Every structure is written in structure tokens, then in C-alpha cells.
């Protein structure tokens, strides 16, 4: 009976943004193992430091295997995973290339003493010229501090994220002009853009009633501040373009901001292989949008579990709101098991949430809508992953499925829940790696099915490279080769810049299937690495008339160069 009661508590109440994370116990094992590098494995440095550049605005990338329908809307900051190191570690990585593309990252990890740990991350990503006058600048700063003593522990997380996008409607014509560079072709609305900013401050405090380091029980207090805002600006003959305006005929400067404060209080229990938290919390939020202003107070229960049992690692959390946004809930669970050279992981989640404030009520220069009724939208997600690092042919296999009901979609200049009632996506991916002497072969195959056919069904890629040392001493290591890929066709989506979201289009136009060809060469000299990458070589041999989205052509030939350096004291 007690086991079922505990399961009910875990599944019924939680409002934590992360799973149970007590500052006491085994969380301080080193995560920066010998051989750790900020740029990852040597054979994929070019991928880690130079994400594929495409012309689509926002974060939607149909060429990546993982996908969620929430990627079509404004995408918010994803915090970095916690790291622990017994010795100070500082690292940076930087890459640059065509279209003024630049990516930089600096990390700092240190155990100040046996009870105090600090982590800092700064990430910057910019580009200019995927289309004329189109660029973005993204900055992310995150600071984490963790401290413990015999009776007290604390976790402090502070982060800021800013995203500044210059936007346009892409090419004015329906086809790309042959014989002209992409960045010299005309565009519409080159003087429009949006800005999103976030600030988060999360402070958890644990007061233990026991001095036994292996068994901790006591009170947990948490306060969290979240601020998000989005702005859109555009200067043009707006009445002629949109047919109406709300406050200015030539200049739009729309904005909304959502600020919220959470206060949680509860109990926790921690031993060597078990960590549990549960309690009650309240949230006050304030929504400000031009002439609109709304605020309310919510109350909820929360719980989180983290345990290890017979080699299985289980992390679970859940929530239920009973005052304010009554009926909102979320259940999430992660299960992992390592067996010799194999690692099995599974993730499942279910949530019921009301649409975002800006989706329900919004006033802008060229938009104006307000919902009378709202419905809870549901999202069900599951994925499994199996990886094997055997000595013969290392491989991995993964699959995922996502189902959404009553998800808000942007149709005819407003968000609606009564049109596309069900949206789902499912995919499976397998890959392997084979090494023979100094020959390295890597390959992966992905297949996906999505509502509306907005994703390519097939994604195929293969890399063949020389993997070995150079010169007599063999201290300079290199992985140099080519990457060949294939992308099947998919339905092109439209983009609404004034609300920063993608729109299902009835144009009937589609991305035409195509082959991909890239060259890469990366080098390792101890803690210092560098790489060069030439991607989209195939575009020099085909007519530039293919599109990734309505008005957004396929990216042409790109050159990339980057370095990384790790410092261990």
C-alpha cells in the first residue's frame, strides 16, 4: 500500500522545472572524465562547432532528426547540463565561415572546495547574409552555483538569453534567379525584425534535520523569477501591405512581456540511491501587451523523484495546478540502464496546458485578437534510445513519437485550437561506426512521418574518412573525409514574422529531394583542436531553384573554420 501511495504522490503533484536535485550526495562525482573536450569527439568536431546553416528564420530545421511542433513557434532558452570537476577547467570553441557566420562558446567549471561548485557558460551565435539584410544574433549566459554543509545546501541558477533577428519575406519571385549569388537577390521587408529576451533566477535552499551525510531529511524552499518578452518592428507602407493598421500607418513596434514569480515549499528526503521532494507552491504572473494587461495567481502541488535501483536509474516529476490555471498538469519520467558496453534509455511525458498568453490575447499594429474560450491542449511524448560501444561495430538506434491535441496553430492572422485538432510526428533512426586500421566509416538512416508532411520522410548520411596520425611522431591526429547525404521531399511552410511562427501553407509547393555533399578535416594536438568544413558542395552542380521554405532558397556553398582549446589546471 505504501508503494502505491508513493507512486500516486509522484505522479500527481509537481511544478519543478527540473527533476529532484539535492545538493547532498552523489551529484558531485566528476562529469568531466579523462579525455573530455568541449568540442566532443574528434570525428565530429565540425558538426559540434558548425551547425548546418540554412536560410529559414527561427529555430525550425527540417533537416534535424529530432523535432517537436513547439519548434514552429518562439523557441526559448534551454539550460546547459550541470558539470562537476575536481580540478578547474576552462575551455572555449570558436568557428567562422561564409555569410559572416560565427559561433563561440566559453565554459568554466570548478570545485572551489569539497562542498562548493561553480559553473559558467557563455554562448554566442551570429550570421549575416543568408538573404540580403537578413541576420541574427543570439547570446546566452548561464551561471550555476551549488554549496552544501552539514545542515544546509543551496543551488543557485541565473541565466539570460537574447535573440535579435532581422527578418524578411524572402525572395520576391517564385523561383531563384539563375546566375546571381543568393545574397544579391531582392527581398521584401528588409527593415523588419524581432527581438526576444529571457531572464531566469532560480534559488533552492535545503535545510536538513539530520547530520548524517548519507541520510538527509528536511525542508526545501525555492523561489524563481522568470521574465520573457518579445518585440517586433517593421517600417513600411503598412496599410497598403496589410490593408489596415491599429496605431501607425508606417511603423510597427509591437511587444509583449510575461513576468512570473514562483514560491515553493516542501519536504525532501535523500539517501545514497534515493532522492524525493514534494510540497506546495504558488505562482504570480503578469502579462503586459501594449494596451492589454492581465495578471493572476496560481497554486499547485509538486513532487520529484530520483533513484537508482538494481542498476536502473529513474527520474520522475509531475505537476497539478488546482488554483488559477485549474487542470494544468505534467508527468515526466526518464529511465536508464547501462549493461556492459550497452546503454538503454527511455523517456515519456504527458502534459495538459493552456495556450500561451500571447496566443490567447494580443494587440499589435497589424494583429488584434482576443479569445473568449480556451481549452487545455495535450501533448504526449515518448522516445527510446539504445547505444552500443562494442569493439567491432559500435551502433545506436532511437525512436520517438509525439502527439498533440488542440494545439494552437496560427491561421488567418490569429491562433486557433479548432482547426488542426491533432498533430503528430514519429521517427526512427539507426546508425553505426566501423573502423579498419586508419579507415573510418560512419552512417545513419532516419525515417519520419509527420502531420501535414512538413518534414522530409528520409534523412540519409554517410561519412568516410582517414582517421590516424600525421608525420613520424604521430602526435598530430586527424580525421579527414567527405560526407554524403540524401533528403527526401517535404511540404514547404510559410513564416509569419510579426508573430514569429510558422504557418501551414496551402501553396502546394514542396522541397524537391536532393543529394548533399560536404568535405571536412579536423585535427587534434592534445588539448588544442581545429577544423575546416566545406558544405553544400552539390549546389555548385545544380540549378539554384530549390527552397527550404516559402521564399527561402536552399543554402549555397559554405566554408567554415574553427578551433577549440581546453585548459585543465
Where are the language model's segments positioned?
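Exposed, low-structure sequence patches enriched in small/polar residues
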Residues: 22-28, 60, 197-234, 252-569
Amino acid at each position: 500500500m505504501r508503494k502505491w501511495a508513493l507512486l500516486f504522490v509522484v505522479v500527481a503533484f509537481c511544478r519543478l522545472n527540473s527533476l529532484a536535485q539535492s545538493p547532498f550526495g552523489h551529484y558531485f562525482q566528476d562529469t568531466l572524465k579523462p579525455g573530455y573536450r568541449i568540442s566532443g569527439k574528434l570525428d565530429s568536431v565540425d558538426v559540434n562547432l558548425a551547425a548546418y546553416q540554412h536560410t529559414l528564420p527561427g529555430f525550425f530545421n527540417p533537416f534535424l532528426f529530432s523535432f517537436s511542433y513547439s519548434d514552429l513557434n518562439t523557441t526559448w532558452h534551454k539550460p546547459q547540463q550541470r558539470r562537476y570537476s575536481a580540478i578547474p577547467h576552462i575551455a572555449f570553441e570558436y568557428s567562422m565561415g561564409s555569410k559572416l557566420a560565427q559561433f563561440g562558446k566559453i565554459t568554466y567549471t570548478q570545485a572551489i572546495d569539497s562542498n562548493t561548485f561553480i559553473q559558467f557558460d557563455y554562448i554566442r551565435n551570429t550570421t549575416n547574409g543568408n538573404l540580403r539584410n537578413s541576420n541574427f544574433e543570439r547570446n546566452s549566459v548561464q551561471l550555476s552555483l551549488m554549496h552544501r554543509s552539514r545542515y544546509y545546501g543551496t543551488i543557485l541558477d541565473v541565466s539570460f538569453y537574447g535573440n535579435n533577428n532581422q527578418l524578411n519575406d524572402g525572395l520576391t519571385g517564385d523561383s531563384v534567379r539563375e546566375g546571381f549569388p543568393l545574397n544579391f537577390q531582392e527581398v521584401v521587408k528588409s527593415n523588419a525584425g524581432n527581438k526576444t529576451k529571457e531572464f531566469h533566477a532560480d534559488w533552492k535552499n535545503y535545510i536538513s534535520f539530520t547530520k548524517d551525510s548519507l541520510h538527509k531529511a528536511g525542508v526545501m524552499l525555492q523561489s524563481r523569477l522568470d521574465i520573457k518578452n518579445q518585440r517586433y518592428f517593421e517600417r513600411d507602407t503598412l496599410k497598403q501591405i496589410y490593408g489596415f493598421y491599429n496605431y501607425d500607418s508606417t511603423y510597427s513596434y509591437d511587444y509583449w512581456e510575461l513576468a512570473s514569480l514562483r514560491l515553493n515549499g516542501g519536504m525532501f528526503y535523500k539517501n545514497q540511491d534515493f532522492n524525493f521532494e514534494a510540497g506546495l507552491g504558488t505562482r504570480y504572473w503578469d502579462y503586459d501587451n501594449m494596451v492589454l494587461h492581465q495578471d493572476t495567481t496560481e497554486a499547485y502541488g509538486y513532487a520529484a523523484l530520483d533513484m537508482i535501483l538494481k542498476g536502473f536509474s529513474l527520474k520522475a516529476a509531475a505537476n497539478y495546478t488546482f488554483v488559477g490555471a485549474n487542470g494544468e498538469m505534467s508527468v515526466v519520467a526518464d529511465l536508464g540502464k547501462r549493461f556492459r558496453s550497452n546503454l538503454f534509455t527511455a523517456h515519456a511525458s504527458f502534459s495538459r496546458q493552456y495556450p500561451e498568453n500571447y496566443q490567447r490575447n494580443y494587440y499589435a499594429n497589424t494583429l488584434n485578437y482576443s479569445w473568449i474560450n480556451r481549452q487545455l491542449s495535450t501533448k504526449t511524448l515518448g522516445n527510446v534510445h539504445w547505444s552500443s560501444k562494442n569493439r567491432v561495430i559500435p551502433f545506436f538506434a532511437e525512436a520517438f513519437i509525439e502527439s498533440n491535441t488542440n494545439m494552437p496553430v496560427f491561421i488567418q492572422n490569429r491562433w486557433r485550437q479548432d482547426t488542426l485538432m491533432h498533430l503528430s510526428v514519429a521517427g526512427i533512426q539507426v546508425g553505426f561506426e566501423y573502423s579498419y586500421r586508419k579507415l573510418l566509416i560512419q552512417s545513419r538512416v532516419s525515417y519520419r512521418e509527420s502531420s501535414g508532411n512538413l518534414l522530409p520522410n528520409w534523412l540519409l548520411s554517410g561519412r568516410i574518412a582517414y582517421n590516424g596520425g600525421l608525420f613520424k611522431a604521430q602526435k598530430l591526429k586527424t580525421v579527414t573525409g567527405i560526407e554524403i547525404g540524401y533528403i527526401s521531399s517535404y511540404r514547404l511552410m510559410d513564416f509569419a514574422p510579426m508573430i514569429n511562427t510558422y504557418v501551414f501553407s496551402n501553396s502546394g509547393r514542396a522541397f524537391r529531394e536532393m543529394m548533399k555533399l560536404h568535405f571536412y578535416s579536423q585535427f587534434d594536438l592534445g588539448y588544442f583542436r581545429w577544423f575546416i568544413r566545406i558544405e553544400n558542395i552539390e549546389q555548385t552542380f545544380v540549378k539554384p531553384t530549390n527552397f527550404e521554405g516559402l521564399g527561402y532558397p536552399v543554402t549555397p556553398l559554405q566554408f567554415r573554420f574553427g578551433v577549440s582549446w581546453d585548459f585543465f589546471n
